[in-house]
Amino acid sequence: MKKLLAILSLFFCMTVTLMAQQVVTTWLSDAVVPGEQTRLFIILTDGSIARQDPLPRVKGASLRWVSQGNYIRWPGSPNQSAFLMAIEVTPDEVGTVEIPSLTLQANNGRTYTTLPQTLTVYPYSAIKWNTLNLNGTAVPYGMLWHVDNQKPYVHQPDRCELKIYAPEYILEYTAPAITTSNLATWRFEPTLVELLRGQPRGSVLYKGVNWNVMTFQSTLFPLRAGEVTASGTVTARAALPEADPLIANFIRSEVLVEMAIPEVKITAQELPPGAPSSFTNAVGNFRISSTTDARDLSANEP
């Protein structure tokens, strides 16, 4: 029960922090393969409209604005809405793409600055491939796990992404059903902007096929030191391939299919020496206190 309350407290704190910030950045996916199109979303939570000035050149990827911006619902902001801008990022090599801080000029005269962003680019070999049998046709699909920290501390949050690479036959997904060993996890959900407003999924052209990319995000919490694992299944709605193109123009049959999620392994570490004995979970079950003799303080005075 304490662990559940701690996790809920962490989620509440993150939500309040997002609502308080005037500039929020979030990725459609921050782990991709070369050629995969992803998006960096910039959200002005006060509803200001910013100019789309030329973007910087970065090593290993191309950047471009992909929309004039639009409004989305954002609780806690004026009129309950925020201004959303999107940058399409397409990497061309394996490694890490570093995007510097961006300065945005708004129509109200304000200047907004984003934090530097990092995009991880995996080799194609990191995708684990499998096949579905749809109406006698073998339909391939792939999955890729991204975990921020491969060696987290016990009970500490470790953000992750599960990415699905599928052809056009796969139409939509339910939330993945995850099976874990010595590991707790949040429910896997689509990315923030997909939840707030339906946004295009990622895509990548690989071996002559245009793969649609769906990303689910979550957080892992190792429960003990050593190797911990996660795997599972995800249910998808798929269109059955029709042998006769003429019939396919008028009739489309659909079916629910179960897609296997490959196992991911991480190695959890014991808490470091000197950690408080009650440092037990993601939020921290410990006490922070301070004292001061001063009665009158100036801004930013220690």
Q: PLM ranges: what are they?
A:
Residues L4-T15:
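Sec-dependent N-terminal signal peptides
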